[in-house]
A protein has these predicted regions:
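Structural beta-strand/beta-sheet cores of well-ordered domains, especially the beta-sheet scaffolds
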Residues: 23, 40, 46, 191, ...
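PLP-dependent enzyme catalytic core of the Aspartate aminotransferase-like
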Residues: 3-11, 114, 132-133, 141-143, ...
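Conserved C-terminal alpha-helix-loop-beta "cap" of PLP-dependent enzymes
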Residues: 307, 315, 319-322, 326-417, ...
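Short, acidic Gly/Pro/Ser/Thr-rich loop/turn segments
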Residues: 32, 49-53, 242-243, 303, ...
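Short amphipathic alpha-helical segments
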Residues: 65, 91, 292, 296, ...
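N-terminal "arm"/small-domain region of PLP-dependent enzymes with the aminotransferase-like
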Residues: 14-74, 82-83
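Conserved N-terminal alpha-helix of the aminotransferase class I/II PLP-enzyme fold
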Residues: 52-104, 126-134
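Conserved PLP-enzyme active-site core in the AAT-like
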Residues: 15, 24-33, 93-323
């Protein structure tokens, strides 16, 4: 195994023995840090001095550990990546500049021109446009399954398929796919299952690795940061996929950029993470700022506390809205009648009571707009997982670029509202909704 050293390093304890709440604080801290600092240091540097020419050459051929350039790695970011990998139980993590950059980096390291990825129909609008526009221009075909039934995914897979892709909880519909069955289908075809686990809150609510996923992408901007103060994404390599099955010569084959180096033979079960870093970050430049990595580290220390509060607030808000005369429908996976409740209860903590819900109001689009514009406490933004309550109108924001037909496939209606409760007292959130309803229904 080559000596690349910017993955999980400086371990002073076995994280697998620790509970999530302990790992979110201790993982990624270097007990041997020479200053004795309790916190992680921020390294605002673009480059690093090489001790001699031989050392520099070794770094660039990936035969020795060390820092090269912050586009590839940074000590602050390395600490953050180690914490994320420990929370998920992955072999390595690669931080990126946004959730979208995590997706595009991961998928372009899996598929090439003329190959395809089979994906869920229930996707975040930005992801849908990435699939429909940018990846298509790169020659990568995205085959959207007609439903989330695993059998529909299976029918689209052929010898050119290089991954199966889904969200652990669809955005914005909150539908939960059968992750375990999708994993079985992907593995039968010899390809990895990639799960966007943004709604799974860094593995606290849902850890797809426990159910057969091979690669996880996550928008760290949401629950990982938790305060709307930083952008970031993350790719986590579960270390379980067999890259030597003949379908991935870009990983188990000679690397054009590294004089024929075979990443799988050199790096073993973390080969995909290495690929994302030394090819993906190098060529696409999707690296995060060390300042943002630091803010993600701070956010992670309170993640379980925040998410537990937000899940409970979501439950109480859903119960309030279900009985309100101004509300036509409430889509909340915590309700037994929700079509995804069974899957949510299987894959998510707290009996599947997720951190987001959707509602449709009585009336038309104008009524919906009036309600949103009348909110005083909740913010009208394209955000979830923030410390403040966020209400989003997907049809005019996150899914605006989609056609009406594509919106319908994604579960987005003209009057749908996505609600992500924050850390405020739930009684204040409900009071804000009540006064907005009164104004909207005048």
């Amino acid at each position: 195994m080559q000596g690349i050293g910017f993955y999980i390093k400086n371990k002073t304890m076995d994280y697998k023995k620790l509970k999530f709440e302990t790992r979110q604080i201790h993982a990624g801290l270097n007990a041997q840090e020479p200053t004795g600092s309790r916190g992680v240091a921020i390294y605002p540097t673009s480059a690093y001095r090489f001790k001699d020419c031989e050392y520099a050459a070794n770094l660039f051929e990936l035969s020795e550990a060390g820092n090269i350039y912050t586009r590839l790695q940074n000590p602050t970011t390395t600490n953050y990546e180690e914490r994320i990998a420990a929370l998920y139980g992955g072999v390595a993590a690669v931080a990126t500049s946004s959730g979208m950059s995590a997706i595009v980096t991961a998928l372009t390291c899996l598929a090439s021109e003329g190959e395809n990825i089979v994906a869920s129909p229930l996707l975040y609008g930005g992801t849908y446009n990435l699939f429909r526009c940018t990846l298509r221009r790169l020659g990568i075909e995205i085959r959207i399954a007609p439903t989330t039934d695993p059998a529909d995914f299976a029918r689209l897979i052929d010898d050119k398929t290089r991954a199966v892709y889904a969200e652990s909880m669809g955005n914005p519909t909150c539908e939960v796919p059968d992750i375990e069955k999708l994993g079985e289908i992907a593995h039968k075809a010899g390809v990895p299952l990639v799960i966007d686990n943004t709604f799974g809150a860094a593995g606290y609510l849902c850890n797809p690795f426990d159910w057969g996923a091979d690669i996880i992408v996550d928008s760290a901007t949401k629950w990982i940061n938790g305060h709307g103060t930083a952008m970031g994404g993350i790719i986590v390599d579960g270390g379980t996929f067999d890259w030597g099955n003949g379908k991935f010569p870009n990983i188990d084959g000679p690397s054009e950029g590294y004089h024929g180096l075979n990443l799988y033979k050199a790096f073993g079960n973390m080969a995909f993470a290495v690929k994302c870093r030394v090819d993906g970050l190098r060529d696409l430049g999707t690296c995060p700022s060390p300042f943002d990595a630091y803010l993600m580290m701070i956010g992670l220390e309170t993640l379980s506390l925040r998410v537990r509060h937000e899940v409970e607030s979501t439950r109480r808000l859903a119960e309030y809205l279900r009985d309100h005369k101004a509300v036509k429908t409430v889509s909340y996976v915590g309700f037994e009648e929700h079509p995804s409740h069974k899957n949510a209860a299987k894959y998510f903590r707290f009996d599947g009571c997720g951190p987001v819900l959707n509602v449709e109001l009585v009336g038309d689009v104008d009524t919906t707009a009036k309600f949103v514009e009348s909110l005083e406490l909740a913010a009208h933004m394209t955000m979830i997982g923030d410390s403040i309550t966020v209400v989003t109108h997907p049809a005019s924001t996150t899914h605006k670029q989609l056609s009406e037909a594509d919106m319908a496939k994604a579960g987005v209606t003209p009057t749908l509202l996505r609600i992500s409760p924050g850390l405020e007292n739930i009684e204040d959130i409900i009071a804000d909704f009540e006064q907005a309803f009164a104004k909207a229904l005048k």
